[in-house]
Amino acid sequence: MKLIVGLGNPGDEYDKTRHNLGFMVIDKIAEKLNVKLDKEKFNGIFYKGENYIISKPLTYMNNSGNFVYDIKNFFDIEIDNIIIIYDEIDLKVGQASIKIKGSANGQRGMQSIIEKLKTENIKRIKIGVSRPLYEPVSSYILKKIPENEKETFEKVIDELADKLLTYIFNDFKTFINVSKLKNSKK
């Protein structure tokens, strides 16, 4: 069983914000599969296919580890079969990169997952939102995506959804081979 988790915050006030890019990728995957995240359990919502789960925690970003821990254990999913998707301020707007393992680099949702699963060996896809120049990170990431960035994010979300469908129906090696994402092992 494969588990793909998009991180974000629940609620209309967070919809279409930089911090909810993980949610947007999951929504795009569901759209391409013509499925709905119709199960609600473990304080999250998900769709369970034959060999995969696509999901969004409803715990708020900083407590995402609780959902990932519970769904992983309930469905007996190996850590090696989990991919987490989230926003990253240290990447340029629209740039995406994959990280096989390592620290959360200050991303609190990922930190929560690392703490709950007791390992840094968790695959993740980071979507760049750039670091703000003149405002606190916390307010910047929770603002709606501005018009001049919407097309860039729509494109990267669509591309990531296609690449993650490759993972769902194949394996991680195939995903890496078809992906043009930067592979970072740090």
UniProtKB/Swiss-Prot annotation:
Which GO biological process categories is it annotated with? protein quality control for misfolded or incompletely synthesized proteins; rescue of stalled ribosome
Keyword Hydrolase (UniProt): yes
Positions of the catalytic residues: 19 (proton acceptor)
Q: Which Gene3D superfamilies match?
A: Peptidyl-tRNA hydrolase (3.40.50.1470)
Enzyme class, UniProt record, top EC level: hydrolase
Keywords, ordered alphabetically: Cytoplasm, Hydrolase, RNA-binding, tRNA-binding
- InterPro entries attached to this UniProt entry: Pept_tRNA_hydro, Pept_tRNA_hydro_CS, Pept_tRNA_hydro_sf
Identify the residues that bind tRNA: 14, 60, 62
Q: What is this protein called?
A: Peptidyl-tRNA hydrolase
Instruction: Read off the lineage from the record.
Output: Bacteria, Bacillati, Mycoplasmatota, Mycoplasmoidales, Metamycoplasmataceae
